[in-house]
């Protein structure tokens, strides 16, 4: 006989793993910079401090993941598979817009089942560097965009600090500063900063460690 108050089968609950996060992408003339923090949490617990939330979809196309870790990665994996087939059929790399449409269609089709927001960014020969937001099956191109739980803390900063015509290094600094500010305020963002710069020449990966992050007032 079960004792009163004793746990029964099915009574144990586990918290869903989330990339409660800050993600960002910025266009510049000739490419894009994509960045994210690295913290993954389940409830109040941090389950991974150095998770790379920048997932490749094709050679020069990446997506930044936020929301449920499993859901976001599932969308990225499905999109990467479809784009690989697409590239083989066309015998040329897929366009960034095509990749964004694939992510948008998957996100919309499974909107009742999946909890995820992906930013798609990359470079192609037709349009150069491009950044697309895909929230809830929406698709919009923007010169820069932010997402994740930490983004609510930095809208004012990015609106004030962004300026057209920035160099790749200025875009990396802009992205690093914005994500650092979000990490300082958002309990679900933290760890290191991953940066990917995508141009016609290829993909450059960088990691900004905790002791290399910029310092701001109050730290």
Curated annotation (Swiss-Prot):
Which compartments is it annotated to reside in? Cytoplasm; Nucleus
**Keyword Ligase in annotation:** no
Highest taxon of source:
Eukaryota
The protein's matches in Pfam families, at most eight in alphabetical order, are given as: Proteasome
UniProt modified residues of type N6-acetyllysine? 53, 109
What positions constitute the catalytic site? 21 (nucleophile)
Name the UniProt record assigns to this protein: Proteasome subunit beta type-9
* Residue ranges annotated as propeptide in the record: 1-20
């Amino acid at each position: 006989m079960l004792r009163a108050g004793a746990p029964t089968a099915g009574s144990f609950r586990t918290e869903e793993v989330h990339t409660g996060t800050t993600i960002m992408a910025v266009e510049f003339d000739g490419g894009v910079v994509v960045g994210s923090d690295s913290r993954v949490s389940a409830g109040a617990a941090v389950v991974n401090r150095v998770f790379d939330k920048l997932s490749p979809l094709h050679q020069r196309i990446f997506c930044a993941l936020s929301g449920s870790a499993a859901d976001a990665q599932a969308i990225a994996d499905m999109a990467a598979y479809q784009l690989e087939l697409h590239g083989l059929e066309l015998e040329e790399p897929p366009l960034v817009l095509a990749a964004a449409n694939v992510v948008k269609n998957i996100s919309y089709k499974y909107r009742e089942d999946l909890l995820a927001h992906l930013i798609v960014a990359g470079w192609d020969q037709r349009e150069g560097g491009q950044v697309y937001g895909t929230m809830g099956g929406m698709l919009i191109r923007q010169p820069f965009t932010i997402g994740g739980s930490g983004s609510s803390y930095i809208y004012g900063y990015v609106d004030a600090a962004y300026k057209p015509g920035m160099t790749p290094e200025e875009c990396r600094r802009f992205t690093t500063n914005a994500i650092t500010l979000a990490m300082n305020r958002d309990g679900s963002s933290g760890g290191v900063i991953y940066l990917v710069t995508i141009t016609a020449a290829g993909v450059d990966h960088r990691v900004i460690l905790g002791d290399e992050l910029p310092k701001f007032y109050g730290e």
